[in-house]
Amino acid sequence: MERAAKKEAVESLNGLFQTTSVAVVAHYSGLTVAQMQKLRSQMKAAGASVKVSKNRLAKIALEGTDVVAIGSLLKGPTVIATSDDPVAAPKVAVEFAKANEKFVILGGSMGKTVLNVDGVKALASLPSLDELRGKLVGLLVAPATKIAQLTTAPAAKVARVVQAYASKSEAA
């Protein structure tokens, strides 16, 4: 790799690390090309990305970013998964690791917080931002629905009483 290409790779990685909210580091030794493509497509579908680069270049790119602490994890054949959503990359990585034993999660970082393997798994078990928004909207709409049901309930009861009285009168 030429010096200019290395510099461009470092700048690209640095820009990625500056804008990401979470990074997951994993070993991928022994994965087939098809498995790596599957990982990339799953990450892309979740709004995350996967980068494989030389560890030395990645360590240089980490300098001056919030995720600088994951530099110690960059040993051997490593892949770095990043996402803006704090749950997307960890969730896909953990699910992929369950299906592929050769994909081993080493740790990660969320902002300036360093995560070990258990931290990444805990982060993956949290609901995504969209799921949380859905629950919040559901909680906000529920009281309005109950009020609407309560205001229509007395009218419905009166209508049933009148209907019962009318059918009783017809029967007599």
Curated annotation (Swiss-Prot):
GO cellular component, one term: large ribosomal subunit
Membrane-spanning ranges: none
Source domain of life: Bacteria
Any one GO molecular function term: structural constituent of ribosome
Keyword Nucleotide-binding on entry: no
Keyword Kinase: no
Protein's GO biological process: translation
Keywords in alphabetical order: Ribonucleoprotein, Ribosomal protein, RNA-binding, rRNA-binding
PANTHER family: 39S RIBOSOMAL PROTEIN L10, MITOCHONDRIAL
Family: Belongs to the universal ribosomal protein uL10 family.
Cited function: Forms part of the ribosomal stalk, playing a central role in the interaction of the ribosome with GTP-bound translation factors.
Subunit structure: Part of the ribosomal stalk of the 50S ribosomal subunit. The N-terminus interacts with L11 and the large rRNA to form the base of the stalk. The C-terminus forms an elongated spine to which L12 dimers bind in a sequential fashion forming a multimeric L10(L12)X complex.
Protein's UniProt name: Large ribosomal subunit protein uL10
Organism name: Rhodopseudomonas palustris (strain HaA2)
The encoding gene: rplJ
